[in-house]
């Protein structure tokens, strides 16, 4: 979640939310009301004027059985009292599961407040902006809808997976004459903890990086490109091998295997003093004796490395919240992690460097701030931001930054952005 606070008549507070809702639709009668309540409470608390909600795995694993719940979910959001003042709505739901070569199960939902005028959306076929008025819900087969761009990643990007729904769904907006893009993305997961333990970057990390670079090249090659916010389920995982090495420094390892079946092999790490099992790693098991505490400690962020190679192109606000995955899908254990994967920050909100120029900082940005690591002093101190009028995406020549932009960047704002979890103490599914 990311919010830019309003500072003047031409500044707009935005709420950007990403949520993998697959597990919610597995238990819709229990979990959908909780998720919806937490989301609407966040809207009421923050009072944004533009909401961008990006969903992944809409409908869950059995989409054909969940379509009615998806329709009810959309209807509930559109008609709820909390969103009654959001009179301009655009919804894109990729629901055509009968077309596996194109199906992504992505959903982009946008809500604009009645006070937000001069709002337009880009038509990728007309190559121009069109006015946004009223409510428009695009669902089912949305291939011919021209105010969005959707792409499924080539299968060779994820050779370890026989079938995948991963891809991106993109829209471009003009919000009070500021051009900006919102890109929903879903990247491939780690299929096996044992394979993920190979030296960083693992085969899974390399596949995700390949797909993300493919997406960024596509965005930057567009002659009409605008600064973008790309947020979704990146499936970024901590360096599993590095984490295991860290937590097993004083332990003894042994491998258990059932005959020649490597799929059932398991690594156990035991205490030398009392032979107690401290860590167990198998294909779909990652279990530590102190599981609910140890992976919330600050040291884990050192192993959150998947953005390293892309930091010159993408910016992220300081992450000061616990790993977003994998949480128990149990309403009685809303803050507990499942013992299936190493907890990781899968769900992220990232910005292009040109989008960062839309935000006002309390000090002049420089290369040290743009490319510094998450643990640097500059990232640790909360900078303040607001949305300002932008230039187009790309690399502006030196000296071409407008006087207005220089003035806005030089002056501090009065309020801060927020980057964190919605429903941190509620059961929001396996992702938060």
List each model region and its residues:
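N-terminal, active-site-proximal structural segment of metallo-dependent hydrolase catalytic domains
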Residues: 1-109, 116-118, 140-159, 169, ...
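His/acidic metal-ligating clusters that form di-metal
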Residues: 181, 208-230
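Amphipathic alpha-helical scaffolding segments
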Residues: 33-38, 68-79, 125-136, 187-189, ...
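Short coil/turn segments at secondary-structure boundaries
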Residues: 28-33, 64-68, 122-126, 184-187, ...
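Core residues of folded domains in eukaryotic genome-function proteins
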Residues: 10-17, 46-51, 105-107, 120, ...
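Metal-dependent phosphoester-hydrolase catalytic domains
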Residues: 89, 128, 154-156, 162-163, ...
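Eukaryotic regulatory low-complexity N-terminal regions enriched in Ser/Thr, Pro, acidic
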Residues: 117-119, 126-127, 134, 162
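Conserved beta-strand elements of beta-rich interaction domains across eukaryotes
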Residues: 21-24, 57-60, 78, 99-104, ...
